[in-house]
């Protein structure tokens, strides 16, 4: 009986070693491991015959079986290592770069002056404690006009100023609708800065574009006054231009702020109009459910293109949109 089982072990070892040496993939190698050494594998089937051996024969047969098992495990691990090394070498060969080949030129990109200006503005206001807010560019009449205290007969609704769509909606003419949407969803106090693209039916020339970018800021809290607005604008201008420039506030009119003002900055010997601002009109507060007897707020807005042109001494707004690499490479 022992001789028969030993012959079975020898036959199993020979067939297993032949199969292992001929296997050329890791999945197949794992299947061979299960076939020969698994719980229901061929070695286990042979070992079940040990129960028929005498007490003297079992230790001898058990030792031979362990030798066969260890030999097959060694062969499996050795073959696995060889296959893994071969796979790595094949991958390296496929990914090897010919360093003698001429490289392909990839020109270095640059930040567009409009993007860099917006980023600079947002960095300043985020540093002042403001949260960045955004909204849709296609707006409803309510958010673009009504909620901002702009009545139906206001000039801003004129077809010459606004792009109206067939379904009654429109392309937003300012980023102020973002403020309304934000206030509807948040209770005061709030401080937000809203950048975005806006649209107006302007004739395109050196200083006007039908599509341009705005940034607006809004602060709502108890006890805010015009002095807080002035301090915020002064802090922004100082960081934006790198110095404390002379600033003047001129009385103006905006339907959504009262009082309202235009802000001028003295830059290189000339006064430049840079933004509009004012205290939030009580009607706007009531439109979003805020109590104007409890809360006050201020808002300000400006064109990004104006700041980009001033900071980079650009003489024509159209240069910002014509994708001329000779121009863009300067930044």
Swiss-Prot record:
Taxonomy, superkingdom: Bacteria
PROSITE patterns: AA_TRNA_LIGASE_II
Gene Ontology MF, one: phenylalanine-tRNA ligase activity
Localization per record: Cytoplasm
Coiled coil: none
Principal subcellular localization: cytoplasm
The keyword ATP-binding appears for this protein: yes
PANTHER family: PHENYLALANINE--TRNA LIGASE, MITOCHONDRIAL, PHENYLALANYL-TRNA SYNTHETASE
Full protein name: Phenylalanine--tRNA ligase alpha subunit
Organism in which the protein naturally occurs: Synechocystis sp. (strain ATCC 27184 / PCC 6803 / Kazusa)
